Swiss-Prot record:
<feature type="modified residue" description="Phosphoserine">
    <location>
        <position position="355"/>
    </location>
</feature>
<dbReference type="GO" id="GO:0005886">
    <property type="term" value="C:plasma membrane"/>
</dbReference>
<keyword id="KW-0407">Ion channel</keyword>
<dbReference type="GO" id="GO:0033116">
    <property type="term" value="C:endoplasmic reticulum-Golgi intermediate compartment membrane"/>
</dbReference>
<dbReference type="GO" id="GO:0060340">
    <property type="term" value="P:positive regulation of type I interferon-mediated signaling pathway"/>
</dbReference>
<feature type="region of interest" description="Mediates interaction with ZDHHC1 and ZDHHC11">
    <location>
        <begin position="1"/>
        <end position="190"/>
    </location>
</feature>
<dbReference type="GO" id="GO:0032481">
    <property type="term" value="P:positive regulation of type I interferon production"/>
</dbReference>
<keyword id="KW-1017">Isopeptide bond</keyword>
<dbReference type="GO" id="GO:0140374">
    <property type="term" value="P:antiviral innate immune response"/>
</dbReference>
<feature type="binding site">
    <location>
        <position position="263"/>
    </location>
    <ligand>
        <name>3',3'-c-di-GMP</name>
    </ligand>
</feature>
<protein>
    <recommendedName>
        <fullName>Stimulator of interferon genes protein</fullName>
    </recommendedName>
</protein>
<keyword id="KW-1003">Cell membrane</keyword>
<dbReference type="GO" id="GO:0005776">
    <property type="term" value="C:autophagosome"/>
</dbReference>
<feature type="region of interest" description="Cyclic dinucleotide-binding domain (CBD)">
    <location>
        <begin position="153"/>
        <end position="340"/>
    </location>
</feature>
<keyword id="KW-0963">Cytoplasm</keyword>
<keyword id="KW-0256">Endoplasmic reticulum</keyword>
<dbReference type="GO" id="GO:0002218">
    <property type="term" value="P:activation of innate immune response"/>
</dbReference>
Length: 379
């Protein structure tokens, strides 16, 4: 089952298969070394040399990086040379401890080869400098993507949080009150269970026209919700408005809802069209999917916002020529109504209390020996 329920093409977060594959490779290499029949001391000697060489190679790379960062101490590190060193080298304690431990095992074990340590270090410096000069160890695109997702460096992450904090968080809490005001003026147009939410469209190709009737003529503008005004970033009474659309099916009105596109998708599309942004169509598609996933995760942690909006993610190129945006929106509205009925449950009928006329007749027998006359004045 896909991680996101919005669209099957939205990727899941990366798991730990990378480390699992490395562990399997570790076990396989240990078994192959054991099958060679070499003495353990000989294997440990070369393992220590190789680990020390790797760590020294990383240290050389970090020192070259430090040479560049020292020229930007004032602008990037607030004049702190220690911050620049930490940014390039990371944690020097663990790093140096591993190098010293590797050299200890290398020097304490018997050297079975005729090659001296100085020769090994010379070859190490030569190979590492050649690799950095020719950029032979650059990260693969998948590695860059994994780092950006893990550290939240993606464009989509910032856009999703900006869209939530700067827009959805402001309008969703008061949406139901504005809908009630609208219904009083427009004969309960948004009275259905599926019409009391904000429906946000997410075309993954980021094609966002300014007029919804251009995307589908069966989507017809009806009116505007009452505006919401709030002071925001120095702007007094900044107005936030939403549009109400009527959906047609077979030429007849089939529903009405509050409908709009996710405006950050326009930003992604504009970036892919501007060469200075360095944003390809593949980057745009990836960031659009991550934008949807991040926004879904944000709303999942905020129930008061999640229950007032619904995300509609679609990709027209994959759906084919038969795709209809109005039908997709109607499908979500009807699904919302079904979920509302399921959550509320079937109506419970309360059995009425039996009246006196519906009771069985009972014979009342007096405990007196003689019957009384009907006239009370004779008593």
């Amino acid at each position: 089952m896909p991680y996101s329920n919005l669209h099957p093409s939205i990727p899941r977060p990366r798991s730990y298969r990378f480390k699992l594959a490395a562990f399997v490779l570790l076990v396989g290499s240990l078994m192959s070394l054991w099958m060679t029949g070499e003495p353990p001391s000989h294997t440990l000697h070369y393992l220590a040399l190789h680990v020390a060489s790797q760590q020294l190679g990383l240290l050389l790379k970090k020192l070259c990086c430090l040479a560049e960062e020292l020229c930007h101490v004032q602008s990037r590190y607030q004049g702190s040379y220690w911050k620049a060193v930490r940014a390039c080298v990371g944690s020097p304690i663990c790093f140096m401890a591993l190098i010293l431990l590797s050299f200890y095992f290398y020097c304490s074990l018997e050297n079975t080869s005729d090659l001296r340590l100085a020769w090994h270090l010379g070859i190490l410096v030569l190979s590492k400098s050649l690799s950095m000069t020719l950029d032979l160890q650059s990260l693969a695109p998948a590695e860059v993507s994994a780092v950006c997702e893990e550290k939240n460096f993606n464009v989509a992450h910032g856009l999703a949080w900006s869209y939530y904090i700067g827009y959805l968080k402001l309008i969703l809490p008061g949406l139901q009150a504005r809908i009630r005001m609208f219904n009083q003026l427009h004969n309960n147009m948004l009275s259905g269970a599926g019409s009391r939410r904000l429906y946000i469209l997410f075309p993954l190709d980021c094609g966002v026209p300014d007029d919804l009737s251009v995307a589908d003529p069966n989507i017809r503008f009806r009116d505007m919700l009452p505006q919401q005004n709030t002071d925001r970033a120095g702007v007094k009474n900044r107005a936030y408005s939403n549009s109400v659309y009527e959906l047609l099916e077979n030429g007849q009105p089939a529903g009405a809802c509050i409908l709009e596109y996710a405006t950050p998708l326009q930003t992604l599309f504009a970036m892919s069209q501007d060469g200075k942004a360095g944003f390809s169509r593949e980057d745009r598609l990836e960031q659009a999917k991550l934008f949807c996933r991040t926004l879904e995760e944000i709303l999942a942690d905020v129930p008061e916002s999640r229950n007032h909006c619904r995300l509609i993610v679609y990709q027209e190129s994959e759906e084919g020529n038969s795709f209809s945006l109005s039908q997709e929106v109607l499908r979500h509205i009807r699904q919302e109504e079904k979920e509302e009925v399921t959550m509320s449950g079937p109506p419970t009928s309360v059995a009425p209390r039996p009246s006196l006329l519906s009771q069985e007749p009972r014979l009342l027998i007096s405990g007196m020996e003689q019957p009384l006359p009907l006239r009370t004045d004779l008593i």
